[in-house]
Amino acid sequence: MTLTASPTAARTPAEEKARFEGNKLAKRLARETTRAIADYNMIEAGDKVMVCLSGGKDSYALLDILLSLQKRAPFAFEIIAVNLDQKQPGFPPEILPDYLRALGVPFHIETQDTYSIVTRVIPEGKTMCSLCSRLRRGILYRVASELGATKIALGHHRDDILGTFFLNLFYGGKAKGMPPKLVSDDGRHTVIRPLAYVPESDLIAYAQFKQFPIIPCNLCGSQENLKRKEVGRMIQEWDRKHPGRSWNVFNALSRVVPSHLMDRDLFDFVGLKPTGVADAGGDTAFDQIDPEPDTAGPGCASDAPAGQADGMAEQRVVFR
């Protein structure tokens, strides 16, 4: 009788540690994705989810995680992977079909030469990403209708959402971000972002752990959006020097207080008048009722460090 060493025994300590860390990461990604799906009711019983697969780390991870969740979900839903071959020079057309066939996942490859359109319209050396994205979005909406998909799943992550918020804030003068769930402007499609709670660093590590066959995203030769790269570096620097800061900003996007901003469409400042009734959710702990002039004490001096508002010490907000 021939004895065969078990796979575990054949691994080195370093390999075993990498496997352990990878499995722990996979569980964390599944947990955060499940939480985002539940928080925003992204996937429902009977849905046909069209997962948009570009060949990048984010969309590979999205498909992998959704397939894992599909097996243990309390309700049934379908998954179909869709890739748009835009005829970019050097794009390897066989990688995604081979990968998806090996997984046994239903898929559709849509071929549309948007590259020629973009290069004809955009001057050489200019960023093509915006027009390319708009053309791609329109095609994917059409394909979703043809396939009968009820949800369109995109691989945007936490850092994408933060980056879009800051781009709109810095360069557009708007407090506008990238929602985890939206209905398309034509009112026909629901777009979801199940990786909304996942930081990019985790997706980079997951792609290395799973060894996804990554396809480069700059085959078109276009200059990547420099402003988005700048904002991305800013967020990375925060995470390095001030752990928790970017998470606090991210958390603030879901804790908006319209009465303490300035948007008259969100809050009726014009019609605002005192009611004589205390706000049950307000802070009245230090309010004084009709203080006597001679009993009012001096103003309280702030002990907060310079440049830091009272009580606003930076801390990381942890989702549970």
Curated annotation (Swiss-Prot):
Q: Which Gene3D superfamilies match?
A: HUPs
Q: Where in the cell is it found?
A: Cytoplasm
EC number(s) from the headed UniProt entry: 2.8.1.-
Report the cofactor remark. Binds 1 [4Fe-4S] cluster per subunit. The cluster is chelated by three Cys residues, the fourth Fe has a free coordination site that may bind a sulfur atom transferred from the persulfide of IscS.
Q: Name one GO biological process term.
A: tRNA thio-modification
Listed name of the protein: tRNA-cytidine(32) 2-sulfurtransferase
Q: Does the keyword Cell wall biogenesis/degradation apply?
A: no
Q: Which GO terms describe its molecular function?
A: 4 iron, 4 sulfur cluster binding; ATP binding; magnesium ion binding; sulfurtransferase activity; tRNA binding
Function of the molecule: Catalyzes the ATP-dependent 2-thiolation of cytidine in position 32 of tRNA, to form 2-thiocytidine (s(2)C32). The sulfur atoms are provided by the cysteine/cysteine desulfurase (IscS) system.
List where the motif PP-loop motif lies: 54-59
Give one Pfam family, short name only: ATP_bind_3
Residues reported in the UniProt entry to bind [4Fe-4S] cluster: 129, 132, 220
